[in-house]
């Protein structure tokens, strides 16, 4: 059985997706349920996931799939006629698909693979990131090695001392763990993504910038998910 707040959140997500196809943000969910902070939304989403009503989609910011509705609500014929699992994915109301693996390019003198560019990521103040496949780029095969990869466009200057500039394209190897000192894609509170150097501070995770103008940010380990590790960089000169 769901609590009143859990049911309110589930129905709000479902109805918003059915009405407009545009997912509610965490701020909108917080305001709709009249909660004081987004941490309450995170707890409700976790509870709904544990009870099998929603499923989080990996490697995507704010991505949820509505699997089922409460029995009383699902029994309403007007609702049931329009019900199908709904997906919240970034700013798009479309079903999410797993990021495709790199596709080998035709044999050539300089071998390359095609890697999907999945969106923009902040090298500065975290922003919502990792959305749909925007386009593909060809990457020298020696740059990436084995594993699944994707690319992100950099927005911000917090990693300039690591040689990563605003407008660069970074190549990321899909990974859920990191070693101290790795430059990683970190997803904070399942909502915001940023590119930072991975550190530990006691039991907490420290996301360290490579620019003295930005402070190192400290989070509990339950608030940060590693989405991948930096393996390469592409820069275009105009």
Curated annotation (Swiss-Prot):
InterPro entries: LexA, LexA-like, LexA/Signal_pep-like_sf, LexA_DNA-bd_dom, LexA_repressor, Peptidase_S24_LexA, Peptidase_S24_S26A/B/C, WH-like_DNA-bd_sf. It catalyses: Hydrolysis of Ala-|-Gly bond in repressor LexA. One of its GO terms (biological process) is proteolysis. Residues 26-46 bind DNA. The active site is at 158 (for autocatalytic cleavage activity), 196 (for autocatalytic cleavage activity). Keywords: Autocatalytic cleavage, DNA damage, DNA repair, DNA replication, DNA-binding, Hydrolase, Repressor, SOS response, Transcription, Transcription regulation. It is an enzyme of class 3 (hydrolase). GO terms for molecular function: DNA binding; serine-type endopeptidase activity. PANTHER family: LEXA REPRESSOR, LEXA REPRESSOR-RELATED. Represses a number of genes involved in the response to DNA damage (SOS response), including recA and lexA. In the presence of single-stranded DNA, RecA interacts with LexA causing an autocatalytic cleavage which disrupts the DNA-binding part of LexA, leading to derepression of the SOS regulon and eventually DNA repair. Belongs to the peptidase S24 family. Homodimer. HAMAP family: LexA (MF_00015). This is LexA repressor. It comes from Sinorhizobium medicae (strain WSM419).
